[in-house]
């Protein structure tokens, strides 16, 4: 039997204290949907000059999931990000856009971060892709959530949209990011300890919805898009 995941290891602040999905309190509580528009804010202090970047969303955030990939922005010390999507047409930068810069111009998802605090405000796909037209965002950056600026009471409770984190994706990618996958005999587990402990804890939260890619429904969307583009599937008129 694998030992429990060390309390010193953070999956993500929104996940660390969630109960087991098999417990009587079962799944994550379903918070009410945040009022629209949702305002996301970087981690620069309100008193800084020229102040934090602000982004507004006119749609609820969908498909929230824990992502272990090495590209997503994660809170300090966390193994996973929590990320979801909104229509690109409903996202606007309303304050201090000049502080934004692209993390990696060659990446499929153009992630725009704050030059000063490093927080990713949104990720956009410009090239042909099944998810083009959707922007990737971190709902925890909503005002009133842990990442937002204190004293601004909008969107109290954050902007997770659908109200919960649905699944875990790209779990094995945390190893690429520096998580030691093996428990060491001498007890010195460094940054990690045991990837099985991580998977076991994620299954306590998400049940069987723990993947090394995206969820099956989203992978089906990608596969169908590729099939229609290649002509192996009939075009939808």
UniProtKB/Swiss-Prot annotation:
Annotated catalysed reactions: S-(hydroxymethyl)glutathione = glutathione + formaldehyde
Cofactor(s) named in the record: Zn(2+)
Keyword Methyltransferase listed: no
Keywords: Lyase, Metal-binding, Zinc
GO molecular function: metal ion binding; S-(hydroxymethyl)glutathione synthase activity
Binding, Zn(2+) 2: 67, 69, 72
Record: residues binding Zn(2+) 1: 42, 44, 114, 117
The EC number(s) this enzyme carries: 4.4.1.22
Coiled coil: none
Gene Ontology terms: biological process: formaldehyde catabolic process
First-tier enzyme category under EC: lyase
Pfam families, A to Z: GFA
Cofactor note: Binds 2 Zn(2+) ions per subunit.
Pathway: One-carbon metabolism; formaldehyde degradation; formate from formaldehyde (glutathione route): step 1/3
Family: Belongs to the Gfa family.
Chain's role: Catalyzes the condensation of formaldehyde and glutathione to S-hydroxymethylglutathione.
Protein name (database record): Putative glutathione-dependent formaldehyde-activating enzyme
Species name: Sordaria macrospora (strain ATCC MYA-333 / DSM 997 / K(L3346) / K-hell)
Taxonomic placement: Eukaryota, Fungi, Dikarya, Ascomycota, Pezizomycotina
